Regions:
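Glycine-rich flexible loops
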Residues: 1-132
Length: 132
């Protein structure tokens, strides 16, 4: 087996080249962010203080086809835009930042925000949005 997955090299390498603040890239398949990525509308609405932090700050990549080869990597990098978080439809998330600490902070608190939203949805009613 190869030491490093070539799709990971493609995705991370392309993002490092195209996104100036992407000194650190974290990619996970965390439980609640992945659940959010599987929803028909994966946008995270502002329903509490954690979700408000990420309102309109998350890019969504709906074209994820399963493997990040060169063309897919270019599309993903372009989808990040000015966001620090990219939600990959039916897959998980990427966070990008100038430091490991910043990338992890976004990763950790985004997962907490997703947990709140997914838990609220499990009540079977739409959560009340915070008026912004």
């Amino acid at each position: 087996p190869e030491i490093v997955d070539p799709t990971a090299i493609n995705i991370h390498g392309t993002i490092h080249k195209k996104v100036p603040n992407a000194k650190c890239i974290l990619h996970v398949h965390s439980k609640y962010a992945t659940a959010l990525s599987c929803l028909k509308d994966p946008n995270l609405p502002p329903i509490d203080q954690n979700t408000m932090r990420f309102y309109n700050r998350v890019g969504v990549y709906n074209e994820f086809g399963g493997l990040g080869f060169e063309e897919e990597s270019e599309k993903m990098a372009n989808s990040i835009g000015n966001h620090n978080i990219l939600l990959l439809a039916n897959h998980g998330i990427l966070t990008v930042a100038p430091t490991v600490a910043q990338a992890f902070d976004d990763l950790f608190y985004f997962e907490k925000a997703c947990e709140t939203y997914i838990t609220a949805l499990s009540a079977g009613k739409l959560p009340r949005r915070v008026p912004l």
